[in-house]
Amino acid sequence: MPRVSAPLVLLPAWLVMVACSPHSLRIAAILDDPMECSRGERLSITLAKNRINRAPERLGKAKVEVDIFELLRDSEYETAETMCQILPKGVVAVLGPSSSPASSSIISNICGEKEVPHFKVAPEEFVKFQFQRFTTLNLHPSNTDISVAVAGILNFFNCTTACLICAKAECLLNLEKLLRQFLISKDTLSVRMLDDTRDPTPLLKEIRDDKTATIIIHANASMSHTILLKAAELGMVSAYYTYIFTNLEFSLQRMDSLVDDRVNILGFSIFNQSHAFFQEFAQSLNQSWQENCDHVPFTGPALSSALLFDAVYAVVTAVQELNRSQEIGVKPLSCGSAQIWQHGTSLMNYLRMVELEGLTGHIEFNSKGQRSNYALKILQFTRNGFRQIGQWHVAEGLSMDSRLYASNISDTLFNTTLVVTTILENPYLMLKGNHQEMEGNDRYEGFCVDMLKELAEILRFNYKIRLVGDGVYGVPEANGTWTGMVGELIARKADLAVAGLTITAEREKVIDFSKPFMTLGISILYRVHMGRKPGYFSFLDPFSPGVWLFMLLAYLAVSCVLFLVARLTPYEWYSPHPCAQGRCNLLVNQYSLGNSLWFPVGGFMQQGSTIAPRALSTRCVSGVWWAFTLIIISSYTANLAAFLTVQRMDVPIESVDDLADQTAIEYGTIHGGSSMTFFQNSRYQTYQRMWNYMYSKQPSVFVKSTEEGIARVLNSNYAFLLESTMNEYYRQRNCNLTQIGGLLDTKGYGIGMPVGSVFRDEFDLAILQLQENNRLEILKRKWWEGGKCPKEEDHRAKGLGMENIGGIFVVLICGLIVAIFMAMLEFLWTLRHSEATEVSVCQEMVTELRSIILCQDSIHPRRRRAAVPPPRPPIPEERRPRGTATLSNGKLCGAGEPDQLAQRLAQEAALVARGCTHIRVCPECRRFQGLRARPSPARSEESLEWEKTTNSSEPE
C-alpha cells in the first residue's frame, strides 16, 4: 500500500462524506490546561480547523469539526468520564492531552478497546512499563531520540565528564541510551536527583565543587529555567560551563536575567519556521496572548499547540486517503458496550503511512507508532537569543555547523578581558629592565607576551597578565588538589595559562589544553671543559710529535740510501758529452750529497725536482718515497681542517645511559615540573633507576627554578634534566654548556584553560594560523638566538683566523730570515776567497745593496780580493801519466796537452770544487757535476786537440 502524502498548505477536497454526518468530520481534543494564555492549544486547534475548512480546493460541503474537552486535574476517573462523553459523538480520532501522563494512559487504553485512533502530544513516560497500543500515535519526539542526540553533542565536544540533573526518577529510563553510551565509552557521568523541596542549589554546589563543566538537565521548561537561575547565583553561568537542556520548549524561556552571556547553553527544537503558515500561526498566538495574558510577555508558540495543529492535519489527510478506497462511516460508541468502530483499524493503517510537512517539521510514523524520519534542531544561546548551530536527524545523526558555532564563540571573545596566569621563565616571560616605571602588561616581555599579542589580534580579546602566586607550574597534592597555574585554572581564578606549560595526561584530566604551540622533549644539560684552542702552530697538530720525528728520520734515511745507491749503480754515471762518445773519458753523477738531500724535499713538498733518477734502483727508492709522501700528505690534509677549526670538548658522558650508570655526576630536574612527573611515572628501567636516585639523593638534586639548575651546572659536577627548548636557550648564551645525547621523550607546550572552556577551539585555530604563517618560528628565533655561541648544527665552511694558521707565517718569516743570513754568509765567503782588490768588504756590501735597491742590471765583473796563491811546483814530467791531467782534488782528467790543460784548470779556479770530485765541464752540461777518470784509449792528435778546444770553450 503506498504511503499517504499530502501538503499542509493546500489540503485536497473530500471525495466522500462520512455516512453519519454528510456535512462534518468530527475530531475530539482533550486539553488539560484551561488557561488560554498559558499554551494557546485551543487557538491552535481552531486555526487548523478554519484553515482546512477555508481551503479553496475543498469539494462538497463537508467541514471539519473539533470538539474540545477540558480536564481540570490529572484524574483517572475524570478522564474516563470525559471519554465516555466523547465516544457517543462519533469521532474519528482523539487528540491530547498535552500533559497529565496518567490521563494519557487512560485515554490510550479506552481508544484501543474501541479501535479509535489516539494522538499523543505529550512526552512519553515510563518507557519500560507502558504498553503502546496499536491505535496510539505519538507526535512528540521520543526521549530515546533526545538521549541519542545529547550523546552526539557530547561526543562532538569531546566531553568525557558530565553531570545529569533529573527532576524525576523516570529520567533514568527515558535517557537509557545516554547512560549506555557512557558505559560503553567508560567516561564519567554523575547523576543527581532533585529532592522533594525542588531546590537545585545543593546539587549545583556539589557540581561546582566537583569541577564538572558539562551539565545535562532533564526537566520541564519551568524547572530548567529555575535551575539555570540558581546556577547564575552561584557563579556557574560563565564561559567554563556548558548546559544542555533536553526539554524541547526551553528555548522559549526568557534569558534577560543572565549577566554573563558567554555561557554555552544548548537546547533542542522541532519548530519548522520555514513553513508557509508558521509566521501567521505565531502572530495569531501572539495576538491572542496579548488579549488574554497581557501581564506576561509572549516568547513564542508552545510546542503542544503546534503538535495539536499538526495532529488535526494528519487525521484529515488519512481520512481523505481512506475515503479514496472505501466508504467509511462513523457511528456513536458507548463505554457500556463492547462495540468497536469497524473502520478504526483501516484508518490507523493510513495514519501510519502519512507523510507531510507540518509546523513541527516532517511528520512520519514508524511501526511502533512513534515519530520517525524527523530532525531535532540544535540551538545555542547568543546575545541576540537562540540560534541554530546544527541538527540531529533520526537517520543521519548529528550534523553541526562548526562555522556558526565558532562565530558565536568569536562574538563571545570579542572585547572580553581574559585573566592570564603565567610564571617568570626566560625567555617565555621576563620583566623589562625598567619595569618599575611601568604598569600592567607593559612590564613584561618575552616569547609568551609576543604570542599573546598575536592571539589577541586574531581573536580580538583583551587580557591581563598575572603571575602565579606560588611560582610553580602545577603538581597534584596528596589531598587531590593542584598547585601552581594548574590549580588556578581549576579554581577558575584565571582564564588562560600561557607559559612553558607541558601537556601531560595527568594535567589533561583536570584542565583543557590548546594545540601545542611548541614541540620539545627532555634533554640533558651539562658543563664542558673546553680543550686547547687552536694556536699559532696548530698546523702541526694533525700529527703527533712522534710522527713528525719519524718523518724526519725517514727523510734522512731516504737521502742517505739514495746517495749510496746512486754511487753504487753504474747507470747513474754518464758522459757529460753524449755527442762526443768515445772521445771523452769523463763520467758525471748528479746525486751529490746536496742533491741527495734536496731530491726528497722536492718530492715531499710535491714540487718535484730537475733531478731525474736513471737507474732502476734509484727509481725504486724514489717511488717508495713518493708513495710514502702521498699517504702522509693526504692524511695531513684530511685532519688539518678539523684541528684548525674545531675546539674539542671534554665530556665524560655521552648519553642518558652513561649518566644513569655512574654516580660521580649528580643529576636532577625542577621540583614539581613535568620532567619530574615523567621520571616518576616512567616504566622504562633506565628512567626508573634515575628516579630512584633523584628521589633518594641527599642533599636533594631537585631545583626550584631553571636559573637555579643552570647555576648548579656551572658551579658543580651536576647534570640538569630540562626541556630541550630551555636547553637550547641557555646553550646559546653560555658556550660552556652542552647537550648530552638526544631527547628522552617528545611532548609539547600548550595554553591551559579550565575544563569545558568554549574558547579552546578558537585558540586551536589561532595557533594553527600562527604556525602556518611562520609567526611562531619567527618569535622563537627572536628570543632564542643569543649570538654568543655558534650553532652546533652549522657545518658550513668558516674562515680561518690568524690564531689558526699564524704559525705557518712564523715559519715562512723564519725561513726568509735564514735565507737572507745564508746569502750574506755566501757573499762574505766569496769575497774572502776572491782576488785581492783595494775595495773593502763593507764597500762591496754597500755597493751590492745599492744595486739591489736601484734594480740595476744583474751583470758585474768577477770579484778579486784574496791574494793569488803561489803557483804549485811543477810536477816532474816523468811522474805524469801521458795523456792525463791532474786536478786539484787529485782526480785525473784526460787532455791533449797536459801542460795547457793544467794551466787552463788552474785559471778556472772558480770552476773547481776544492776537495770535491765535481767540476763543470761545458756550457751544455753545467748541471753535471761528478767527474770520474776512466781508462782512456789511445787517441790521435786530432782527438786531443778537439777535446782541448771543447773543454776550454766555457765562458768566463
UniProtKB/Swiss-Prot annotation:
Binding positions (L-glutamate): 500, 502, 507, 674-675, 723
Signal peptide segment: 1-20
Keyword field contains Membrane: yes
Quaternary structure (record): Homodimer. Can form functional heteromeric receptors with GRIK1, GRIK2 and GRIK3.
Annotated region described as Disordered, given as residue ranges: 863-889, 931-956
Bilayer topology term: Multi-pass membrane protein
GO biological process, one term: synaptic transmission, glutamatergic
Gene Ontology terms, MF aspect: kainate selective glutamate receptor activity; transmitter-gated monoatomic ion channel activity involved in regulation of postsynaptic membrane potential
Function of the protein: Ionotropic glutamate receptor that functions as a cation-permeable ligand-gated ion channel, gated by L-glutamate and the glutamatergic agonist kainic acid. Cannot form functional channels on its own and produces channel activity only in heteromeric assembly with GRIK1, GRIK2 and GRIK3 subunits.
SMART domains linked to this entry: Lig_chan-Glu_bd (SM00918), PBPe (SM00079)
Family: Belongs to the glutamate-gated ion channel (TC 1.A.10.1) family. GRIK4 subfamily.
Alphabetically ordered keywords of this record: Cell membrane, Cell projection, Glycoprotein, Ion channel, Ion transport, Ligand-gated ion channel, Membrane, Postsynaptic cell membrane, Receptor, Signal, Synapse, Transmembrane, Transmembrane helix, Transport
Species: Pan troglodytes
Any one GO CC term of the record: cell projection
One Pfam assignment: ANF_receptor
Entry's localization field: Cell membrane; Postsynaptic cell membrane; Presynaptic cell membrane
Protein name from the UniProt record: Glutamate receptor ionotropic, kainate 4
Glycosylated residues in this chain: 158, 220, 272, 286, 323, 408, 415, 479, 736
Residue spans, topological domain Cytoplasmic: 567-623, 826-956
Record topological domains on the Extracellular side: 21-545, 645-804
Residues that span the membrane, as ranges: 546-566, 624-644, 805-825
Basic and acidic residues compositional bias, start-end: 939-948
Main location: membrane
Source domain of life: Eukaryota
Keyword Magnesium applies: no
